[in-house]
């Protein structure tokens, strides 16, 4: 038995280790909330939690701060009052009591140095170490990336620039900040690594600096950034000719390298790559769960398995979600809290590219396709309509997919033609095999016989699966279960429904797009960073809020938050 297997923690040991980190994150979150004047229920508002975590990630980003300080030195020559250390965070605050509760948007000022000081007091002084802040903030960045994937299909533009737009289902983690990308590599889709590799190949051709730098590789060696990217691609790629192609890229010429990467990406739509899936919740949700579970909290500190679904449900009972005026499609439309709850659920579990009919079979309420949703960007808007606790819950659970969906032997540009599984549940293949074959047939002929041989073998794998698509199943033998079926006694068979693709175009629904002209940009307040300044207007109606329904579920939590006066 390998040392790695011998040292593997038991589930109880793993939950205790998780709880240690999660509790430290919660305490740091509470302290920063208090620093910017948030108390009680306000700490449990989702949009506040997202804003605070974004501020933390930016304050811990050394390169961002270096650029900002450079701009500050230039700005100070023109404005002696400029403060490079000051940042503004846009938040939702509560006013009134009983049935006369209102919520309004404000911008609270604090400083980077103060946030860093708070983090050091809870996490230790070495914030630059991956084990101290890297993993914590990496998971925070992963949630933010999942959110953007659902709202904007963030990976589609990158996929279109670097190949075919259909490849966006391979771009999990496309929005993760560069600093955390390699820390979170095993949670990132192969399409993101392929896009990075193409960028490095282009940079080498154009003579850009940094493409030949020495970086750490696996097994303690060093090499170029391209070698590091190709190691990650080789590890994720489906076993067989795709991995052999990945090993050829570093030494191949420009055209061959790009073509090999295209083949790996396009074939990966069907020959599914490996990716590690975990549940990741914002810290405000972990705080909400801790307030409910109290002494039992440690037993629910899980990122996978049945308890991950349970702790998500528990957190959803206490958090508040804001409804603002203005959606992605219509500036005058009011956001739907039910739709935002669905987006939150899908972001926490990374479900943007999972079989949508499977996700729908696991939750308590009907779900919507993306183009039917009334949502904004999850930032704090100017006009708060309501703040409510969502009703959406999981009723079933399944193991997370940590293995290859298939074993090794086995013009619709921009539309979704494939799924990327999150849950290990037996299902038929949903990929449009014909479209994958069309993409692969674009590969040009080469005199390089070994590459041609590998391309031929990839096509053969695709053809075999295409001919036997109706008989082949992914995750053979795996099932989902009722949430109370802890021992997996009654497996539930799944049959894919009519809508396997979340981003499927719905011809029966054609929303009217209404976007108001942008207001003139007001003179920038030099004491507020760009972090939360987007959309802020000095003459706006910030603070002019409508009456809200009180959060009955949250009303009794204030006195339970540590350090609350």
From Swiss-Prot:
Q: Identify the domain of life.
A: Viruses
The primary site where this protein sits is virion
Recorded GO CC terms: helical viral capsid; host cell; host cell nucleus; ribonucleoprotein complex; viral nucleocapsid
Q: Which InterPro entries match?
A: Flu_NP (IPR002141)
Question: SUPFAM superfamilies attached here?
Answer: flu NP-like (SSF161003)
Q: Single Gene Ontology BP term?
A: viral penetration into host nucleus
| Keyword line | Capsid protein, Helical capsid protein, Host nucleus, Host-virus interaction, Ribonucleoprotein, RNA-binding, Viral nucleoprotein, Viral penetration into host nucleus, Virion, Virus entry into host cell
List the molecular function annotations (GO) for this entry: RNA binding; structural molecule activity
Q: Compositional bias (Polar residues) at which positions?
A: 554-565
According to the record, the residues making up region (Disordered) are 518-565
| Cell location | Virion; Host nucleus
Instruction: Tell me how the protein is altered or processed after translation.
Output: Late in virus-infected cells, may be cleaved from a 56-kDa protein to a 53-kDa protein by a cellular caspase. This cleavage might be a marker for the onset of apoptosis in infected cells or have a specific function in virus host interaction.
**Family in the record:** Belongs to the influenza viruses nucleoprotein family.
Function of the molecule: Encapsidates the negative strand viral RNA, protecting it from nucleases. The encapsidated genomic RNA is termed the ribonucleoprotein (RNP) and serves as template for transcription and replication. The RNP needs to be localized in the host nucleus to start an infectious cycle, but is too large to diffuse through the nuclear pore complex. NP comprises at least 2 nuclear localization signals that are responsible for the active RNP import into the nucleus through cellular importin alpha/beta pathway.
What's the subunit arrangement here? Answer: Homomultimerizes to form the nucleocapsid. May bind host exportin-1/XPO1. Binds to viral genomic RNA. Protein-RNA contacts are mediated by a combination of electrostatic interactions between positively charged residues and the phosphate backbone and planar interactions between aromatic side chains and bases.
Can you name this protein? Nucleoprotein
Q: Which organism is it from?
A: Influenza C virus (strain C/California/1978)
């Amino acid at each position: 038995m390998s040392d790695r297997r011998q040292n593997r923690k038991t589930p109880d040991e793993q939950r205790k280790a998780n709880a240690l980190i999660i509790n430290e994150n919660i305490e740091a979150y509470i302290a920063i909330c208090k620093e910017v004047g948030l108390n009680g229920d306000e700490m449990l508002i989702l949009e506040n939690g997202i804003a605070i975590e974004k501020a933390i990630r930016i304050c811990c980003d050394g390169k961002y701060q270096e650029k900002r300080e450079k701009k500050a030195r230039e700005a100070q020559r023109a404005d002696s009052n400029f403060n490079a250390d000051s940042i503004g965070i846009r938040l939702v605050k509560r006013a009134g009591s009983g049935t006369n509760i209102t919520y309004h948007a404000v911008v609270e000022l604090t400083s980077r140095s103060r946030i860093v000081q708070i983090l050091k007091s809870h996490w230790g002084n070495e914030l630059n170490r991956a084990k101290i802040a890297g993993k914590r903030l990496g998971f925070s960045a992963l949630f933010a990336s999942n959110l953007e994937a659902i709202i904007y299909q963030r990976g589609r533009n990158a996929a279109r620039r670097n190949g075919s737009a259909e490849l966006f289902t391979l771009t999990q983690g496309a929005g993760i900040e560069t600093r955390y990308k390699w820390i979170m590599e095993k949670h990132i889709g192969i399409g993101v690594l392929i896009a990075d590799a193409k960028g490095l190949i282009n940079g080498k051709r154009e003579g850009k600096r940094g493409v030949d730098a020495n970086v750490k590789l696996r097994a303690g060696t060093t090499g170029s950034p391209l070698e590091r990217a190709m190691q990650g691609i080789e590890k994720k790629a489906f076993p067989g000719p795709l991995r052999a192609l990945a090993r050829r890229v570093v030494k191949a010429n420009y055209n061959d390298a790009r073509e090999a990467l295209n083949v790996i990406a396009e074939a990966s739509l069907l020959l599914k790559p490996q990716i590690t899936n975990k549940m990741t919740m914002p810290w405000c949700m972990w705080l909400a769960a801790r307030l409910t579970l109290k002494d039992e909290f440690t037993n629910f500190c899980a990122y996978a398995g049945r308890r991950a679904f349970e702790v998500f449900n528990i957190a959803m009972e206490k958090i508040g979600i804001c409804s603002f005026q203005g959606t992605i499609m219509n500036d005058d439309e009011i956001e739907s809290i039910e739709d935002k709850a669905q987006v939150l659920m899908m972001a926490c579990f990374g479900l943007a590219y999972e079989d949508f009919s499977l996700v729908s079979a696991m939750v308590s309420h009907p779900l919507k396709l993306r183009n039917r949703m009334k949502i904004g960007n999850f930032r704090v808007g100017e006009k708060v309509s309501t703040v409510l606790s969502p009703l959406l819950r999981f009723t079933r659970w399944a193991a997370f997919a940590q293995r290859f969906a298939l074993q090794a032997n086995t013009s619709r540009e921009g539309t979704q033609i494939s799924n990327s599984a999150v849950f290990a549940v037996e299902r038929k293949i949903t990929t449009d095999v014909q479209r994958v074959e069309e993409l692969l047939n674009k590969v040009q002929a080469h005199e390089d016989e070994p590459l041609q041989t590998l391309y031929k073998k990839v096509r053969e794998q695709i053809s075999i699966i295409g001919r036997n698509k109706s008989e082949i199943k992914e995750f053979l033998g795996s099932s989902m279960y009722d949430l109370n079926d802890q021992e997996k006694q009654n497996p539930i068979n799944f049959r894919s429904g009519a809508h396997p693709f979340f981003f499927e175009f719905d011809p029966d629904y054609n929303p009217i797009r209404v976007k108001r002209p942008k207001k003139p940009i007001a003179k920038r307040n030099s004491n507020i960073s760009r972090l939360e300044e987007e959309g802020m207007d000095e003459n706006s109606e910030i603070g002019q809020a409508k009456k809200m329904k009180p959060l009955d579920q949250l009303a009794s939590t204030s006195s339970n938050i540590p350090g609350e006066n």
